[in-house]
Amino acid sequence: MIDLRLLRDDPERLRASQRARGEDPGLVDAALAADENRRAAVARFEALRAEQKALGRRIASAPPDEKPALLDRAKELAELVKAAEAARDDADAACREALLAISNLVDDEAPRGGEEDFVVLEEIGTPPTFSFPPRDHLELGERLGAIDVERAAKVSGSRFYYLTGVGALLEFALVDLALRQAVTAGFVPVIPPVLVRPPAMEGTGFLGQAAENVFHLEKDDFYLVGTSEVSLAAYHMGEILDAAQLPRRYVGFSTCFRREAGSHGKDTRGIIRVHQFDKVEMFSFTTVGEAAAEHRRLLEWEKQFLTALEIPFRVIDVATGDLGASAARKFDCEAWIPTQGRYREVTSTSNCTEFQARRLDIRMRDEQGIRPLATLNGTLVAIPRTIVAVLENHQQADGSVVVPRALRDYLGTDVLRPKR
């Protein structure tokens, strides 16, 4: 949620942010109007309540001949106070809804523009050149006995998959490597719930523009998380944290669920875009002043992981028009996919500043009092796309795949060989 003081003091800054995102700046004006209405409703309620209290004192000391008229007024005031209280509550709820509709204030340094206006910050590693026609990840995975989408389609429909044999072992190896790296860096490992209630989903910003990609269990009013960011952010919902103990860093492993609405016809082959996948996610609670530096640290941990897998990748600074509602700035790591001849996103890290913390009522206490804090998230490994990158970049002419050195102890082999 945006800072109400910012809305009142500098609404044009918020309008400019909305325009930079390609979103409606009129939402800012709607929020201003809702705030004015709320303040007027609060003032009317408080004035009537004050009159009611004063009248109560008068009645207590009034002579008998004056009491009937005063009691009539007291009855009238009681009805007015009740109506004013309801109007205040309605105005407060409407103001909150108006504030929730506005996305986070974009970072001044985030590049402006749409999806294709990102800025490449660096390229790490060199895309491989093959002396043979490279196979895509699905063909490699099927030959290795690692990926089965045909049976998954029979069981669950499109955009599902089985990881079998070395495919399943490869997932466990990647998760183990990611968790060991994160724990070494000081993260607390967490296995969070994947079913959450509306306040957690709304608080993290996934019930606005992203709502169409969320699975909702309507009967029980649960949501399936698309990332453990949701569960990890809400872990301290309604709490006040000691600033001296920040940053608090958690690394969560969970299954993630996405409807992929609007993706019809995109990435229909293989496991690049699926409805269900596993992911290791970093999450940090820190001070607002440390948020930008923490963002860079999360990015460095992502780069460290991909470098260990010997995958060529690049880092991009995502343009404002491609940011999620909660992110003020986002960096993506994109791995080279040989058969597509382009880079594809495999990890991302976002600085959400105070936005999620305000919505989730998470604050910190320091010598200056109780204040908002910042939240940040970063993918350490999203399993399907990382497997895609590993298989395609490390393939050999016979369809075998060289195992990255960082995974060999876990897998117990240097090379994954075709079963057919």
UniProtKB/Swiss-Prot annotation:
Primary subcellular site in the record, as a coarse category: cytoplasm
Pathway recorded for this protein: Aminoacyl-tRNA biosynthesis; selenocysteinyl-tRNA(Sec) biosynthesis; L-seryl-tRNA(Sec) from L-serine and tRNA(Sec): step 1/1
Record keywords: Aminoacyl-tRNA synthetase, ATP-binding, Cytoplasm, Ligase, Nucleotide-binding, Protein biosynthesis
Record's protein name: Serine--tRNA ligase
A Pfam match: Seryl_tRNA_N
Any one biological process term the GO annotation gives: seryl-tRNA aminoacylation
Family named by the database record: Belongs to the class-II aminoacyl-tRNA synthetase family. Type-1 seryl-tRNA synthetase subfamily.
Annotated NCBIfam families: serS
Documented EC number(s): 6.1.1.11
Protein function: Catalyzes the attachment of serine to tRNA(Ser). Is also able to aminoacylate tRNA(Sec) with serine, to form the misacylated tRNA L-seryl-tRNA(Sec), which will be further converted into selenocysteinyl-tRNA(Sec).
Subunit structure: Homodimer. The tRNA molecule binds across the dimer.
Localization annotation: Cytoplasm
Gene: serS
A molecular function GO annotation: ATP binding
Reaction(s) catalysed by this chain's protein: tRNA(Ser) + L-serine + ATP = L-seryl-tRNA(Ser) + AMP + diphosphate + H(+); tRNA(Sec) + L-serine + ATP = L-seryl-tRNA(Sec) + AMP + diphosphate + H(+)
Binding site for L-serine: 227-229, 281, 379
